[in-house]
UniProtKB/Swiss-Prot annotation:
Ranges of residues in domain LCN-type CS-alpha/beta: 20-82
Cross-referenced SUPFAM superfamilies: Scorpion toxin-like
Signal sequence segment: 1-19
Record function comment: Beta toxins bind voltage-independently at site-4 of sodium channels (Nav) and shift the voltage of activation toward more negative potentials thereby affecting sodium channel activation and promoting spontaneous and repetitive firing. Competes, with apparent high affinity, with anti-insect and anti-mammalian beta-toxins for binding to cockroach and rat brain synaptosomes, respectively. Also competes with an anti-mammalian alpha-toxin on binding to rat brain sodium channels. Has a weak effect on cardiac sodium channels and a marked effect on rat brain and skeletal muscle sodium channels.
The record's note on its domains: Has the structural arrangement of an alpha-helix connected to antiparallel beta-sheets by disulfide bonds (CS-alpha/beta).
Subcellular location: Secreted
Disulfide bonds: C31-C81, C35-C56, C42-C63, C46-C65
Name of this protein: Beta-mammal/insect toxin Lqhb1
PROSITE patterns xref list: LCN_CSAB (PS51863)
Length: 85
């Protein structure tokens, strides 16, 4: 019984480590996925990419996703956008 509880707790910890919050990445352009006050489209796009919840971050005009894998998120360090849309 202790082993089962240990395995469940370990699995939950691993799942938590592999997810992150951030702007969704448009893999074709390397840019953030843009939006204009459309939470529904950002939420569905986030869920398609295995995230929990997504919304349109108004000031950045980009979809923000919570709980998505890091491979689906835009990162400043690996930014390849250069103004392309």
């Amino acid at each position: 019984m202790k082993i089962i509880i240990f395995l469940i707790v370990s699995s939950l910890m691993l799942i938590g480590v592999k997810t992150d919050n951030g702007y969704l990445l448009n893999k074709a352009t390397g840019c953030k996925v843009w939006c204009v006050i459309n939470n529904a489209s950002c939420n569905s796009e986030c869920k398609l990419r295995r995230g929990n919840y997504g919304y349109c971050y108004f000031w950045k005009l980009a979809c923000y996703c919570e709980g998505a894998p890091k491979s689906e998120l835009w990162a400043y360090a690996t930014n390849k956008c250069n103004g392309k849309l």
